């Protein structure tokens, strides 16, 4: 289940760093395959959880991130993965919708859209597609982290990441005045 968080963040970093090196088709394929793996992991985790017969919450991972025991006895901030009936269902929802968005984006983000809004400094439109898939992978990572959060602090971190990645996706066509205006709302 840890892999469901690792795959999208690795895709974000890889596609973000390889923006000028990958073709549109390779970036789209890599992003879709990565989310396809998350989809399989999400469905497997949810089905295994529900098939177990016990709907008790499970902490798959619980690690101390910040330890304040010197200040107050037993006070720490933990990061982890928490699976209960709601988060198991949301795993299915988030991974399914993210996978479908990746598939749809392969056809929608055609050259006409990218050339129309390509930034002059980039020289051509091919760099935009990798950036889009990197932002989409960050959004998926953020949503999955939000769904699997173990505490309110972790939930807040991922909620903010959802906001940042939404801003980046809404303002993707940063040379279009309408997209710039929409991303400021």
Kindly label every feature range from the protein language model.
Residues 10, 14, 100-117, 161-173:
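Juxtamembrane interface elements at the cytosolic ends of transmembrane helices
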Residues 3, 79-80, 146, 155:
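Residue-level marker of motif borders
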Residues 24, 132-185:
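Alpha-helical multi-pass transmembrane bundles of energy-transducing inner-membrane proteins
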Residues 4, 11, 34-37, 41, ...:
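Hydrophobic residues within membrane-embedded alpha-helical segments of Major Facilitator Superfamily
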Residues 5-20:
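N-terminal signal-anchor/start-transfer transmembrane helix
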Residues 18-134:
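Transmembrane helix-loop-helix hairpins at membrane boundaries of multipass inner-membrane proteins
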Residues 1-7, 85-95, 152-165:
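Structural signature of hydrophobic alpha-helical transmembrane segments
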């Amino acid at each position: 289940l840890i892999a469901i968080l690792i795959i999208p963040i690795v895709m974000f970093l890889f596609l973000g760093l390889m923006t000028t090196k990958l073709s549109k088709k390779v970036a789209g394929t890599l992003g879709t395959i990565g989310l396809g793996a998350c989809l399989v992991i999400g469905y497997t985790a949810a089905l295994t959880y529900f098939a177990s017969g016990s709907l008790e919450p499970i902490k798959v991972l619980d690690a101390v991130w910040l330890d304040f025991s010197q200040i107050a006895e037993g006070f720490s901030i933990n990061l982890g993965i928490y699976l209960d009936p709601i988060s198991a269902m949301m795993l299915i929802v988030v991974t399914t919708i993210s996978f479908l968005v990746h598939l749809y984006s392969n056809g929608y983000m055609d050259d006409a859209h990218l050339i129309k809004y390509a930034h002059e400094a980039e020289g051509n439109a091919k760099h935009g597609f990798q950036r889009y898939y990197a932002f989409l992978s960050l959004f998926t990572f953020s949503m999955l982290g939000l769904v699997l959060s173990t505490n309110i602090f972790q939930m807040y971190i991922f909620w903010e990441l959802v906001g940042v990645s939404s801003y980046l996706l809404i303002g993707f066509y940063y040379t279009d005045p309408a997209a710039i205006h929409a991303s400021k709302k």
